[in-house]
Amino acid sequence: DQADLFDSQGNPIIYLPPHSTRMIGTGLCFAPPEGWAILGFARSGLATKKGLAPANKACVIDEDYRGQAFVPLHNHSDMSQEIVHGDRIAQFMFVPYYQAQFDVVDELDETERGAGGFGSTGK
C-alpha cells in the first residue's frame, strides 16, 4: 500500500442521527514520541458517501497524550448513519513539529506584501 496515512476503524456499532456529533473510539492507543504529533483527517469516501467527517476538521494528538484516540464524527447528512466495526472513520499521520518561542515586540519588519492577505499575492 502506497498511502502515506494510516486508517483507524470504529469499534462497536454506533448510530449517528442526522446533523449530530458523537465521539467514536478508534481502538488505537498512542504515546507519540517527543517532538511528534499525530494529525487525523476525514476519509474522503466516508465524507462523500455518508456525509460523515470529523467535527473539528482535523484531530490533533499531542506528544503528551496517552490513551485511545477518539474522533468527534459529525453526520452532515439528513439521514441516520451507521458505523460498524471495521469501518474506516479517519486517517492519521505522524508529523514532527517545532515548539515555537515567541517574543513580544512593538513593531514588525516591513515587507513588500505587508499585512496583505486573502488573495493579495495575485495567485
Language-model features, listed with the residues they occupy:
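DUTPase catalytic domain/fold
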Residues: 1-123
